[in-house]
């Protein structure tokens, strides 16, 4: 899988892979705009989703 990351305005980031686009931002307290989940929020959510998948399948 190829992932392309684009730097948007302020601290916003965009990752494109397959047919998906994911936008990330930092919270206002970290000088972001709070317009999207932070990269770390996505990391935690993806870990929980992986665990949930394996619980459901096995």
Question: Each PLM stretch: what is its role?
Answer:
Residues 50-51:
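Alpha-helical metal-binding/catalytic segments enriched in His/Glu/Asp
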Residues 1-45, 55-58:
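Extended beta-strand/beta-hairpin segments
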């Amino acid at each position: 899988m190829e992932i392309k990351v684009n730097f948007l305005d302020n601290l916003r980031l965009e990752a494109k892979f397959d047919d998906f686009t994911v936008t990330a931002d930092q919270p206002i307290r970290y000088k972001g705009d709070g317009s999207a989940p932070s990269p770390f929020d996505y990391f935690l959510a993806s870990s929980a989703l992986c665990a949930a998948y394996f619980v459901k399948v096995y």
